[in-house]
Amino acid sequence: MWSGDRSAAAGSGGAVVTVAFTNARDCFLRLPRRLVAQLHLLQNQAIEVTWDRQPTYLSWVEGRHFNDQGENVAEINRQVGQKLGLCSGEQVFLRPCSHVVSCQQVEVEPLSADDWEILELHAVSLEQHLLDQIRIVFPKAVVPIWVDQQTYIFIQIVALMPAVPYGRLETNTELLIQPKTRQAKENTFPKAGDAHGQFRSYGQEQKGMSKELQTKQLHMNTEGIPGSNETDPKVPSDSSWKAHWWTMLGSMFSLGPDNRQATSWGSSEISVFKTMQSQDVPLDSVFRVCRVQPPSVRDTPATSVFHKHCTVHVFPWDQEYFDVEPSFTVTYGKLVKLCSPKQQQGKTKQSVMSPEKEKHPLESPNHKQIGSDHTEEAGEACVLKVVWNGLEELKNTTKFTKSIEPLHLGKVWIPDDLRKRLNVEMHAVVRITPLETTPKIPRSLKLQPRENLPEDVSEDDVRTGFSSWLQQSATTMLPLVISKEERIKLGIKDGLKEFSLSVVHCQEREKGRGETAFVLSAVLLRKISVQVLLEPMIREENSEEIDFLLPFLKLNSLGGVNSLGVSAMEHITHSLLGRPLSRQLMSLVAGLRNGALLVTGGKGSGKSTLAKAICQEACDGLDAHVEIVDCKALRGKRLESIQKALEVAFSEAAWRQPSVILLDDLDFIAGLPTVPEQEHSPEAVQSQRLAHALKDMIKELVSVGSLIALIATSQSQCCLQPLLVSAQGIHTFQCVQHIQPPNQEQRCEILQNVVKNKLGCNINKSSDIDLQRIAKETEGFVARDFTVLVDRAIHSHLSRQPVSTREELTLTTSDFHKALHGFLPASLRNVNLHKPRDLGWDKIGGLHEVRQILMDTIQLPAKYPELFANLPIRQRTGILLYGPPGTGKTLLAGVVARESGMNFISIKGPELLSKYIGASEQAVRDVFTRAQAAKPCILFFDEFESIAPRRGHDNTGVTDRVVNQLLTQLDGVEGLQGVYVLAATSRPDLIDPALLRPGRLDKCVYCPPPDQVSRLEILNVLSASLPLAGDVDLQHMASVTESFTGADLKALLYNAQLEALQGRLLPGGLHDGGSSSDSDLSLSSMVFLNHSSGSDDSAADGESGLDQSLVSLEMSEILPDESKFNMYRLYFGSSYESELGNGTSSDLSSQCPSAPSSVTQDFPAAPGKEPLFTQHPMFRTPSQEGYQELTQEQRDQLKAEISIIKGRYQSQSGEDESLSQPGPIKTSFAISQAHLMTALAHTRPSISEEEEKDFAELYENFQNPKKRKNPSGTVFRPGQKVTLA
């Protein structure tokens, strides 16, 4: 039973655990993760273990494969537990020690003579693995030390310095070992103070020879055993050492004659090699070449084993291991590169496939492990040193694997020079196998430079440099093992030169063609002849770069997409298990199980650049391989070719995992058809089949647990096949990032980064650029537009001021203004924008309240966006204009678009409707997409009642679906940003009421017929450019035009203008032919009425229409003589002109009375009267039936009459010279009051009194629904469709 005090201590800073024995080959106490967190333990922290005996102190590790049964269980090696007096199942109390002292010196003693002999024979192994087995020691402790997999010895801790109850072994701790011989006596052991052995730190070179025979102690070094075993004459003879020497001498004579010299010469090096090769390391393992140098290698001194010649470093996948202190094992092995699927495919194309390979075609690398039956080695194997970091972790990986084994056992880092020499690219796969044969000792070496040497370099300089290099690269405890030919770099004349080191003769002749390795050391070099050649050897130049460097920008160099980039990078990091938290929590959903990333955005929005920047960050930060598939380039190819390209990319990514696959512009090969008519086209069928194939590839990678992340780009999520974006089944894309059009702040960032990337300078340092002003003027621009804009600005600057270097180029705001002139952004290309007429608010008469509402709702927010952006409530963006026809609704929409400076898109209602299911809704979506792309934009729907009637009244259901789509677009979740919706109708009662609720078209503005004051304003506006006579009284005209709308007043002025034209051109027709009312030539009979009930209303076209007619009248006065025949055609047709020789019939055929452009349509001839001629000649064009050729008498008569008309016309209009001179309209051509009254007599209002009453009642009921007559008296017929909206 635990006492009360101990229970209290357990609750405050300790824990009670149950001891369980294991077969682990170390002295660490293994604790479950929950207990580690409970005790707040730190790395290398000591733990006090207390039970019924004296407390002991142990070091701890976390049990990675711990079997937690719900209680605190601490595992420890059986031999350690028994020596401490523990029993399996016994309960002990654990308490973390707050402070641990590092030991400077530790004195130990083997427990028996057998232990001493075993320790003496396995000194090298113990030096390399001692710290892997024990870290915390305390006096009088007896601990086991393992020298191999099955053998262990016991040592006792004698004393610690400084004298502390417990301490920690460090890499620089000196370890004094007292030898224990079989005939040892008490007086034969020296004191601890006289010992010379020490335990040196990692990376330190040996500085002196050992004197272990003199002191009877072992001199241990963490990097190797002593460099030689030289004897001292002062060493006393000992029977045990004599027996040792006799035994070694007998073994020498027992060997063959060829092995005697090898035993006496280089025996220590061969012995060390065999000891190192006896280490328990993974055999024939596959590793992935990593890019980043691990911190454990980067932080070590340059003299350590990590930086020796031909040394590779193996690490486990867990990157957390890089943060702990390095404990490594060094062995010798062979490294060979394995061909990837793409490289194997390239070799297959270059050579003819053998019959064996035809039977076994290339397989996908998604298998459990790599075997020699389906992999191909690239190049010859290279002999090198292998530094195993985290060996226990690597062993656990092979031992505790899941049902599906990983492709690679771990990572291997190869120095750049060695990697390039072996032609191994980044993220390649290599196989490391142990060196099975014993290395031989060379007799002769040859050194030859691979580059030109300075002239003053001699052979002695090369030999000196080689000797220095060999002393740094090899010691007796860690000899250098090389292949038959190596490339080394020697320091010659204060510079590094590359040499080729080759073995000319070896001590033993090769038997067969087996693998050959040679051992070198500074001691062996004394008896090896070195041949030096100063002439450089001829080598093949290989200028190709084996590493493919991604030429992409990083996320911090883009601008405007920082939040999107961070979010997308978080998804990729979790998918590739790039963080400790990801490895702990998301190991079951790694790779594509976490879903793919979809980046969407419009054309030129930068989605491909963002995706490539994410790939660049993943390559740099996560050491991921990147495979890019340009789907746009695959469009139009055969299905088999596209599928093969995708399979190669996926296989390559699986081979080099962790990897990132980028499918750029995926909608080009796996997208939906643009129009419903193409749903069953061959392209659509192929796109659907490719989507199925892509889905199958992803499922296969998910099933084998590949560490692959997938990124795809598309214009929108709806553009892809439903199989890839369906909400049912497996979600392919679980992270969707949409790039919105940039706001002003984002445009500043984009512009700043584009200039910085192109010019290499920071734009903030230039005070000549006003970024805020340029960003405000580039509304609607996307990333690609800014790239083109900067190019145009640079071109503008260079054309103005040439520079010689890029640093001298300094852009200014004026350069950007010149670049913006005439530049159309990509978002506005292929967008049907309707340019409003050049009219302002001053060109509108009346409608003051309506104008003010439009200004407050649309114009002011467009001019002051920052002010309105701070409003807490969402501002109004939809307005419905309703009123009788001709009251100026269309005119208001155009004027507000021009005054606000926004883009203008006008939609006629019926043009959105289609007979195909879904086409009408798609047309509505496309319209709003166009408006979003062109924002700030005004979207104007004319004849709105035709596309948005009440639901339930359409037998086909087309308009019902259109209304539903409009409701979604007007008041969706995202809302409209920068798009204002205007709708015009004369029948608001027919519109679905759901569209008129707040948040949609929430403001209904009534455009009433003009009263007398408004009519006077309209007449003043319309007649501003007309030549009015002094007797014109517009006030009187406004009073006598009751019920006239703006369109009617426009028609009135048209007719008055034509009356003035008749009096100007044909004044005799009003007097010679009788009264004007009886004359058929009177142009007053051509009245212009506005009977349309649609949107060509009001002065929207009136002002410009009058201006155009005035221009035609002005031109009639200044026409040249050739154009005067248009008047003759008014009466005689074009055939007479041909007869007079004024043009061929082909040239004048377009001017015949039947042609649309004929002037006779505007001024029709009067067939019944002939006031200007004494005779009535009837002539027809040659194309008309009944044509007769004119006689000479008829021609003479016509010429005489034409001359009379010409003389009368010239006398009225003045000299011919004045006709060719442009000038203002003459005062003789003026619209008088009589012309207005004559036109009024033939002009009637477009809306009758009865229709006006109906409209008034209709609008009254619409504005006040509660005042409707008999609101509940409606009788429904059986089968009638109604709506509850």
UniProtKB/Swiss-Prot annotation:
Enzyme class: hydrolase
Biased segments, Polar residues type: 344-353, 1142-1161
Residues binding ATP, per UniProt: 601-608, 883-890
Molecular function GO terms recorded: ATP binding; ATP hydrolysis activity; protein transporter activity; ubiquitin-modified protein reader activity
Catalytic activity: ATP + H2O = ADP + phosphate + H(+)
Assembly information from the UniProt record: Homooligomer; homooligomerizes in the cytosol, interaction with PEX6 promotes dissociation of the homooligomer. Interacts with PEX6; forming the PEX1-PEX6 AAA ATPase complex, which is composed of a heterohexamer formed by a trimer of PEX1-PEX6 dimers. Interacts indirectly with PEX26, via its interaction with PEX6.
Descriptive protein name: Peroxisomal ATPase PEX1
Species, as recorded: Cricetulus griseus
Gene that produces this protein: PEX1
